[in-house]
Amino acid sequence: MVKNSSVRTRKRVKKQITDGIAHIHASFNNTIVTITDRQGNALGWATSGGSGFRGSRKSTPFAAQIAAERCAEIVKDYGIKNLEVMVKGPGPGRESTIRALNAAGFRITNITDVTPIPHNGCRPPKKRRV
């Protein structure tokens, strides 16, 4: 007779981290918020589109604020208190995301703009004629 042995998976222990980095990618169409530790390992992320906004509502500052609140909710178990913010892109969700992270209880120590600027690299897209 074979005994039924239950397979136990080890419960993942969330390590306590005090300092983190918030990467905000604010494009014209969407806003992506990722919170990592100092080494760059992602702890949690959220997007405007994943927060229930679709189409042109994805690219609003309010959608970026909701995405930042959801990301803060995901990583609060890690015990992060201080955040360094890296903002990339020209989108409308740049400032509202930082305000939402501040309101979520994080102490923002540093804000850095890491938007890539070409030294006359690729040709930009043609201007829209509407």
Curated annotation (Swiss-Prot):
Among PROSITE patterns, the record links this protein to: RIBOSOMAL_S11
Cellular component GO terms, alphabetical:
ribonucleoprotein complex; ribosome
The reply on keyword Amino-acid biosynthesis is: no
Q: Which SUPFAM superfamilies match?
A: Translational machinery components
One GO BP annotation here? translation
Q: Which residues form a coiled coil?
A: none
Keyword list, A-Z: Ribonucleoprotein, Ribosomal protein, RNA-binding, rRNA-binding
Q: Which GO terms describe its molecular function?
A: rRNA binding; structural constituent of ribosome
Q: Key word Secreted present in the record?
A: no
Q: Which family does it belong to?
A: Belongs to the universal ribosomal protein uS11 family.
NCBIfam families referenced in this protein's UniProt entry, alphabetically: PRK05309.1, uS11_bact
Describe its partners and assembly state: Part of the 30S ribosomal subunit. Interacts with proteins S7 and S18. Binds to IF-3.
Its function, per the record, reads: Located on the platform of the 30S subunit, it bridges several disparate RNA helices of the 16S rRNA. Forms part of the Shine-Dalgarno cleft in the 70S ribosome.
Q: What is this protein called?
A: Small ribosomal subunit protein uS11
Species per Swiss-Prot/TrEMBL record: Buchnera aphidicola subsp. Schizaphis graminum (strain Sg)
Q: What is the lineage of its organism?
A: Bacteria, Pseudomonadati, Pseudomonadota, Gammaproteobacteria, Enterobacterales
